[in-house]
Amino acid sequence: MLNVPSQSFPAPSSQQRVAAIGRSKVPLKPGRSLMDWIRLTKSGKDLTGLKGRLIDVTEEELAQHNKKEDCWICIRGMVYNITPYMEYHPGGEEELMKAAGRDGTDLFDQVHRWVNYESMLKECLIGRMAIKHVSISKEVTSVENKMNKHLNGSVASSKMSRTSSKESHPWYDWFQTESLVTVAVYTKMKNVCSELVIVDHLENVLRGEIIIGDYSYLLHSELSHPVQKDIEVKVSATAGKIEIKMKKKEPVSWKSLGQPMDGHNSFLKHSQRGLYYRKCRLASKTDINYNTKLFCVQLPQGCHLQVPVGHHIYLKMNISGVDIVKPYTPVASCLLPDAQYSTFCNKQCLYLMIKIYPNGSITPHLENLTVGDYISISNPQGTFSSFQIENVMDVFLVAAGTGITPMIRLLQHVLTCVSSLRKAKLIFFNKKEEDILWKEQVEELSLADKRFEAQLILSEPSVKWTGYRGQISYSLLNESILRTEEGSKILICICGPNAFVDQGISFLQDLGFSKEEVFAFRE
């Protein structure tokens, strides 16, 4: 029997409920809470209308189910009948109908980022979207198989059939020596970077995903023979080539790379892939201030994962029978540049700055974790591109509270790697002085690098505070955001609670900054 907690979920003052302020919410009927939905999904009732069958759904068929009484949506390539969920949605039927009969991935990412839709809607799953993705044949002809024998296990991928309407797409070869197996992926794209390559080797299953613009190429295979846990990933940026090297446990000759698994050799829209999680070990947990901690999370052996600047990961925990997910942007263990190279560049660790909410849906559980416990972390997600800071001269980072997290590595990156930079300014809003995260380090950095300036603003300062006071406003931003020279390339990033971000964007638009000059990170 489901053990239902007495308090509502999420808790009344949790960040999830607070974050919903500003979105349209409707009163739910009695018996239509999240916990009531969980009870319904566990009741055994057929919520799909297909009596347990899973089907492939075409775009045309999906579009036909676009009514309140018959509503299907697609989320990351999977199709759900959300008709029975309509009355349980806190945003109301109108919000869900925005994605009726079409792809609702963006809608769920915006409104339900804190809930794992795969768990919440698993009893509503109808099947997989029959996506017209770029795929490479899993099988080669018998003639090609004969050729492979002369290639020492190399898959003659160049001869594989291609069903792509695209002019170019990735393909792969593999080859072996007595002690080593190498998988080579050819992306046909220059300037491939290591951060766009995610590889996991777990229990003799190799999963490699390469992000190419809005698309994703996936290798997914159960290997023919055991290999050592640790893998090596080499990226040749100019050639657009990626090599995954694995050491054999036994010096035997492989006849094939292995058994293809779900999604192997596919090339499709990144948004259509489900999030992939791996279990990571909590290595340390330290206090930053009275309510915020720095978590150091160790990636498992055989995992190659580097989070691009400005991107986040999802952290997942199972709470009261529901998989709760929450986005967090990795930071460095210290704001100062010297520490960046000694800590964050340990590619097997991620650092997460997390504010603990006593009545939050997930952070109290994170606070109770001890060193050695495991949590699940997803592949990186995000839309920020490093091209946005190429040749930039002025960077302004507008943050409120833990909205500073995406700014930390971005600040380090522009100060270290952008030669055109003339000015980087952090405009940091908090309530009280004790809320200012890494205050001493911010001040040290401003002394260490003359290009960096910090403007600390408090809305509820003590009488001893001599700095800036107030809240985000048109006049404050007008006085604080000034180009170093007329016509200089500028980037303004903003992050914080939704209301803060919405206000800030409105003020910046009124000040005449273009959409290309403003980027919003959403908490």
UniProtKB/Swiss-Prot annotation:
Its cofactor is FAD. The keyword Transmembrane helix does not apply. It comes from the Eukaryota. It is an enzyme of class 1 (oxidoreductase). FAD binds at residues 367-382, 394-426. It holds the Pfam family Cyt-b5. One of its GO terms (cellular component) is endoplasmic reticulum. Its main location: endoplasmic reticulum. This is Cytochrome b5 reductase 4. It comes from Xenopus tropicalis. The lineage of its organism: Eukaryota, Metazoa, Chordata, Craniata, Vertebrata.
